[in-house]
Amino acid sequence: MPISFDDTDETLRHIRLTGRLDMTGIDAISETFTELSVATHRQVIVDLSGVNFLVSFGIRELITNAKLIQQRGGRMIIFVGDNKAVLKTLETTGIDTLIPTFVNAAQAGRAALG
């Protein structure tokens, strides 16, 4: 499962996940995802617009890292773009009420900075 990131500045990091967030996908990126999430950046936008499959293992990974970010005073924001399948999964499980979730990139960016 591909993972990439870029830093807007010293406080905001964008992490992009692509592919399947299932057991195999999580095994492939878990350590890197955690390292990128809990770096010195306080705000992290996780881009799931390129994820084509999301199951409980992926949801657990998101929650675990969101908690780690929160423990150091930061916040995770999820961006799904027009990925209706992932958005529906996040809404059905209630994750969108725990981790702010956006379909609009500009709104996600404002939420991360605000």
Where are the predicted features?
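Residues that form or immediately flank small-molecule/cofactor binding pockets and catalytic motifs
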Residues: 10, 83, 106
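Short acidic-hydrophobic, aromatic-tinged amphipathic segments that line or gate anion-handling sites
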Residues: 99-104
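Short beta-strand/loop segment at the start of cytosolic alpha/beta domains
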Residues: 1-16
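Residues at or immediately preceding the N-termini of alpha-helices
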Residues: 26, 105-106
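A short, charged, amphipathic alpha-helix used as a generic interaction element across diverse proteins
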Residues: 108-114
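Amphipathic alpha-helical interaction surfaces in cytosolic regulatory modules
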Residues: 23-98
